[in-house]
Regions:
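Sec/Tat-exported extracytoplasmic proteins
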Residues: 78-82, 131, 287, 325, ...
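Transmembrane helical bundles and short interhelical boundary loops of multi-pass, membrane-embedded
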Residues: 445-545
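Membrane-integral, polyisoprenol-dependent glycosyltransferases
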Residues: 1-297, 303-362, 368-372, 378-447, ...
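Short, structured coil segments at secondary-structure junctions
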Residues: 224, 678-681, 735-738
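Disordered, low-complexity segments in secreted/periplasmic proteins that are enriched in proline
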Residues: 274-278, 282, 287-315, 320, ...
Length: 756
């Protein structure tokens, strides 16, 4: 045979690209690792982060001190390193907040650097939101491409409850960032089997525990199981790595717990939220299993698991889709669940298809030993199989985290606020980005059917959510429904008809899915938030907005945590930093059409979707949220929201304040926080947040007074159920009988240095 007659080398197997999409969902010719970064990817990521930063930083100071309970602890930590370490409510270290202090540390450092202001307190929270979006983008992009990462990051950024909490000073912002970081580290460990990633994940979980105790460990079981089953290392090494990760959790969380438990109780602040001055009691009781069972001694509304969740909404599988929860988090939840099931199913079946083809290649290789083309194709299939295994593991990780958190939140009977749902936001966003990218890259009719169905379901659910606020942007729900129908039909067109049509339909589908959340988020950004119970978006029909059913007054009135008749700007409104007026309220708790002109931060705001004079819910009206009805206001006013401190009251407390350990004492942390933030002097919070903690006892309080450590007692405020083992109610009675009353405007003080 002449050289010209000899057959040439076999042609290489066709490369797998996004354009050469397989025709079935289980085709083993799946696109593998994402292509190298295109020129548009980095600018797109920068744009996403800049838009997120602008959204979260815009008019940030309009919320004043937000949750004064935590702001007072931040102020204390900026004045005292001991208060910083323990998370004390005041710089004199009488009692701590009812959480570990990690979430307070970034804010306290910011206040030390920039001085006390709303901006200094809230900027770290906003930056945490930007960081969470960036980390989520990177975690999703690694296996599913830049488009998936951008979609996931964007979905997280505009989730209403995420925008709410990344502009607020509750611990949930830091917890969300740490959980995204923990999952990202576990995914890196699943990709390369390196121990350092699991150790870093353990550190994130440990710091999460120091942020919000056991909630940080909700997703530990599914992540550990997935790693134990899917890690690319030997089984024995997997368990060794998991043990090291567990050790990292213990060390990163345990150092603080050990110091607190070993520290002499007499020389540290009382552990707020506990009944016996113990952090472990707080962890496993009030903040732990009590949240599941409803048996929370010392909590708002008393202990005892009430059927159906008592004052915190009905429990059950539909809880997060209900009127007062749905608009916070559930916009993309149906899509995430559909894409989770589809992604796992597709990748599992593709695994079997790849295994079958590999077996066939091995048989051919045996017959044609040394044939280069067969060996090359077999190696390509091994690469595809490995990539599909990695993608499958990522679906299991994000899906496991979502299902574990969703199930817990749906059925827990204890305290449950709408803003807790931020924990679900990154898991939902990741699954939407991953699932959409997986189906888009595979192409074919089955993928088109699933994508079209997902868009249609999302548009339909968005219509339902928007219809719960019928007078707010009434055109939006119909627009979303129409665009969703067009997008679904466009995705069903044969791809050969026009690829441009398919791309346009996909873009339209993204717009449809995000239109509702974006509108809710813009409304949230344009509405000042304050108090202990806050929600995102406009008022809704049938929403409770908080534990209305569990307290006198029933329905909730007022959307920003203010009490009807005692709203921000009134006598019992929320204290704002210097230069900021409160948000006006009409008698009865109705929010005025326009806030007072002196309110800072209103200049240059985003256009508020549907902005108009609107009521925030009179007592008894469906949809009122954030504050209690009139009958509840008398009992709960100082418990959930702070007080407006007049200039005269501020001057009274500041006079000779340096001669005392505490300028004043008040029942409940919110009441004390208002005066502390106004004067920047320590104010003792008797009974902690609920006014029900036995700190201090009457005997101890008498000692403080006899030693000249407290100047004034602030009348008002409200102890929790039963007055907290008699402590706060006994102190109030003793003070009223013993000392001279001083009235300043609407506020009443007792001078503890002058007996009546």
């Amino acid at each position: 045979m002449t050289p010209q007659q000899r057959p040439g080398p076999p042609a290489p197997p066709p490369s797998v690209t996004r354009e050469s999409a397989p025709v079935s969902l289980t085709d083993p010719r799946t696109p593998v690792a994402p292509e190298p970064a295109a020129r548009w990817e980095r600018p797109a990521l920068v744009a996403l982060l800049l838009v997120t930063a602008a959204l979260y930083l815009w008019s940030l100071s309009s919320s004043g001190y937000a949750n004064q309970f935590y702001s007072a602890a931040v102020q204390a930590g900026s004045e005292s390193w001991k208060a910083f370490f323990f998370g004390s409510s005041d710089a004199a270290n009488s009692i701590t907040v009812d959480k570990p202090p990690a979430a307070l540390w970034p804010m306290a450092l910011s206040v030390r650097l920039f001085g006390l202001s709303s901006w200094a307190i809230l900027v770290p929270e906003a930056l945490m939101g930007v960081a969470a979006v960036g980390v989520l983008h990177g975690a999703v992009r690694r296996r599913f491409g830049a488009g998936a990462g951008l979609l996931a990051g964007g979905a997280l950024a505009v989730t209403p409850v995420a925008a709410l909490m990344f502009r607020f000073n509750n611990p949930d912002a830091l917890l969300c960032l740490l959980m995204v970081g923990a999952v990202a580290c576990v995914l890196r460990a699943l990709a390369d089997g390196r121990t350092k990633w699991l150790v870093l994940a353990g550190v994130c979980f440990g710091l999460g525990f120091l942020t919000k105790t056991l909630q940080a460990w909700l997703i530990l079981p599914p992540l550990a199981v997935v790693y134990a089953c899917c890690a690319p290392v030997a089984l024995r090494r997997r368990f060794g790595q998991l043990l090291l990760a567990g050790l990292a959790i213990v060390v990163s969380a345990g150092w603080w717990v050990a110091l607190v438990e070993l520290w002499p109780a007499a020389s540290r602040p009382y552990i707020g939220g506990s009944q016996h001055n113990g952090f472990l009691e707080l962890t496993f009781g009030y903040n732990g299993f009590g949240r599941i069972t409803g048996n929370e001694t010392g909590s708002v509304g008393g202990g005892g698991g009430r059927p159906g969740g008592g004052g915190w909404g009905e429990t059950g599988i539909t809880r997060l889709f209900s009127s007062d929860m749905g608009g916070q988090i559930s916009w993309l939840l149906p899509a995430a669940l559909i894409l989770l099931v589809t992604g796992v199913t597709v990748l599992w079946r593709a695994r079997r298809a790849v295994a079958t083809e590999q077996a066939g290649h091995r048989a051919v290789a045996t017959e044609q030993a040394g044939h280069r083309a067969v060996a090359t194709e077999q190696a390509d299939h091994q690469v595809v199989a490995a990539e599909q295994a990695g993608q499958r593991a990522e679906f299991l990780v994000w899906g496991g985290a979502l299902l574990m958190t969703f199930t817990t939140f749906s059925f827990m009977s204890g305290i449950f606020h709408q803003y807790y749902n931020i924990a679900l936001a990154p898991y939902i966003a990741a699954l939407v980005g991953m699932g959409a990218a997986l189906l888009w890259r595979r192409g074919g009719r089955p993928a088109a059917y699933v994508l079209a169905g997902t868009v249609a379901v999302t548009a339909g659910w968005s219509f339902v959510l928007l219809n719960r606020s019928p007078d707010w942007l009434p055109w939006l729900r119909w627009t979303v429904a129409a665009l969703g129908l067009l997008a679904a039909l466009g995705l069903l067109l044969p791809i050969r008809a026009s690829r441009r049509v398919a791309v346009l339909a996909a873009g339209l589908g993204v717009v449809t899915a995000l239109a509702g959340p974006v509108a809710y988020t813009l409304d949230t950004v344009n509405t000042p938030k304050g108090g202990s119970i806050i929600t995102a978006g406009p008022t809704v029909q049938g929403g409770m907005g908080g534990p209305g059913g569990g307290f006198p007054g029933g329905r909730m009135g007022g959307r920003n945590g203010g009490l009807p008749g005692a709203g921000q700007g009134g006598a019992a409104g929320q204290a704002l930093p210097p230069g900021q007026g409160g948000q006006g309220r009409m008698p009865g708790g109705t929010q005025g059409a326009n806030p007072p002109p002196q309110q800072a931060g209103k200049q240059g705001q985003f256009p508020a979707p549907g902005a108009r004079g609107r009521q925030a819910g009179r007592p008894g009206l469906p949809g009122g949220r954030g504050g209690f009805g009139e009958r509840g206001a008398g009992r709960m006013g100082g418990l959930l929201n702070g007080s407006k401190v007049s200039d005269r009251a501020k001057a009274l407390l500041e006079k000779d304040a340096d001669d005392y350990t505490w300028a004043a004492a008040a029942i409940g942390s919110q009441n004390a926080a208002s005066y502390q933030l106004a004067t920047e002097k320590p104010v003792m919070a008797i009974g902690g947040f609920n006014g029900s903690d036995p700190s201090p006892t009457l005997a101890r309080f008498k000692e403080y007074v006899a030693d000249g450590k407290i100047h004034y007692f602030i009348a008002g405020g409200q102890g929790g159920p039963g007055g907290g083992r008699g402590g706060s109610s006994q102190i109030t009675s003793w003070v009223a009988k013993t000392f001279q009353k001083v009235t300043v405007g609407d506020a009443t003080f007792y001078d503890l240095t002058r007996k009546g």
